[in-house]
From Swiss-Prot:
Keywords: Electron transport, Heme, Iron, Membrane, Metal-binding, Mitochondrion, Mitochondrion inner membrane, Respiratory chain, Transmembrane, Transmembrane helix, Transport, Ubiquinone. Pfam families: Cytochrom_B_C, Cytochrome_B. Belongs to the cytochrome b family. Component of the ubiquinol-cytochrome c reductase complex (complex III or cytochrome b-c1 complex) that is part of the mitochondrial respiratory chain. The b-c1 complex mediates electron transfer from ubiquinol to cytochrome c. Contributes to the generation of a proton gradient across the mitochondrial membrane that is then used for ATP synthesis. This is Cytochrome b. It comes from the Eukaryota. Its cofactor is heme b. It is a multi-pass membrane protein.
């Protein structure tokens, strides 16, 4: 008798995706982050659901409703901090996942890669709107500054901003709609992630060498399920340590002050995972130029496949490209640091140099390095 998991219409889908899936035998720990992102997403939806049961999306009660969750709701504090720090873990996994794709040339799977870029944008939008909900000082001013950037769009900019605000400033209408979008987007992300997975399984996983492994595949279960469980345990351990020992480590103290439209915080800055993009935005003195650079800093990922000049897929055997890749990582860390610093000398010039380096490495140096490596190997 055939196993039910291979015949039942629903079980068959699960079986083909997580049990009998043919997988390369040599994929490393860098391939764990996809499943970790799935775990993060489920965790965020669950904790978010319980927070939404107690949250009030009104400007007069939003801040106190979050305080109420932390003080009066059973284990509300742990749910709130799991959600806040879960977002940080989510972005750590996202950056690692994207970095893996860049290093090992996974971007040659065009559909999977482009859906991944859409997922990254959707996750960033969700995180931004979630940051506004506690209605602290940084929530309010972050929302004001970032939504205001749209006013740089010629002709329709001002109308667009007021349309998003639902008025002439960030107010009750803005908070309510941000809550609505923050609630619905994770479900859209879940559906998109399934499409991401569907396209991935159409072609099969890449592996560290970048060489097709079709003739040498192993089943996903038990080999990679056990590996994913190890990754999940490490992720949850890290998250629990963060939540129980230093829950406010990655947050901003200004967000413990209720939103006040009459008092601007000395330094307006987003959460740490947006600082690199914020630094790129600030490094350009022109408003529209800054907004374009901000969007392009993420959208550049979509054109990475067009810039691939090497005849090898992975960077595993390409030392020049490896050096450039790790320079890019260091540059992103520098941008993250600069994004959190005040706008004054020497931070301005460092930010401008780091921003130029970011685009120069991706658009110029990496394609050139690929061509040089081809010539060195006489290909």
């Amino acid at each position: 008798m055939t196993n039910i998991r291979k015949t039942h219409p629903l079980m068959k889908i699960v079986n083909n995706a997580f049990i009998d899936l043919p997988t390369p035998p040599n994929i490393s720990l860098w391939w764990n982050f996809g499943s970790l992102l799935g775990i993060c997403l489920i965790l965020q939806i669950l904790t978010g659901l319980f927070l939404a049961m107690h949250y009030s999306s009104d400007t007069t009660t939003a801040f106190s409703s979050v305080t109420h969750i932390c003080r009066d709701v059973n284990y509300g504090w742990i749910i709130r901090y799991m959600h806040a720090n879960g977002a940080s873990m989510f972005f750590i996994c996202l950056f690692m996942h994207v970095g893996r794709g860049l290093y090992y040339g996974s971007y040659t799977f065009l559909e999977t890669w482009n859906i991944g870029v859409v997922l990254l944008f959707a996750t960033m939008a969700t995180a931004f709107m979630g940051y506004v909900l506690p209605w602290g000082q940084m929530s309010f001013w972050g929302a004001t500054v970032i939504t205001n950037l749209l006013s740089a769009i010629p002709y329709i900019g001002t109308n667009l901003v007021e349309w998003i605000w639902g008025g002439f400033s960030v107010d009750k209408a803005t908070l309510t709609r941000f809550f609505a979008f923050h609630f619905i987007l994770p479900f859209i992300i879940t559906a998109t992630a399934m499409v991401h997975l569907l396209f991935l399984h159409e072609m099969g996983s890449n592996n560290p060498t970048g060489i097709p492994s079709d003739m040498d595949k192993i089943p996903f279960h038990p080999y990679y399920t056990i590996k994913d469980i190890l990754g999940a345990m490490l992720l949850i351990l890290t998250l629990i340590l963060l939540v129980l020992f230093t829950p406010d480590l990655l947050g901003d103290p200004d967000n413990y002050t209720p939103a006040n439209p009459l008092s601007t915080p000395p330094h307006i800055k987003p959460e740490w995972y947006f600082l690199f993009a914020y630094a790129i935005l600030r490094s350009i003195p022109n408003k529209l130029g800054g907004v374009l650079a901000l969007v392009l800093s993420i959208l550049i990922l979509a054109i990475v496949p067009l810039l691939h000049t090497s005849k090898q897929r992975s960077m595993m055997f390409r030392p020049i490209s490896q050096c450039l890749f790790w320079t890019l990582v260091a540059d992103l860390l520098a941008l993250t640091w600069i994004g959190g610093q005040p706008v004054e000398y020497p931070y301005i010039i460092i930010g401008q140099l780091a921003s130029i380096m970011y685009f120069f490495i991706i658009l110029v140096l990496m394609p050139v390095a690929g061509t040089i490596e081809n010539n060195l190997l006489k290909w």
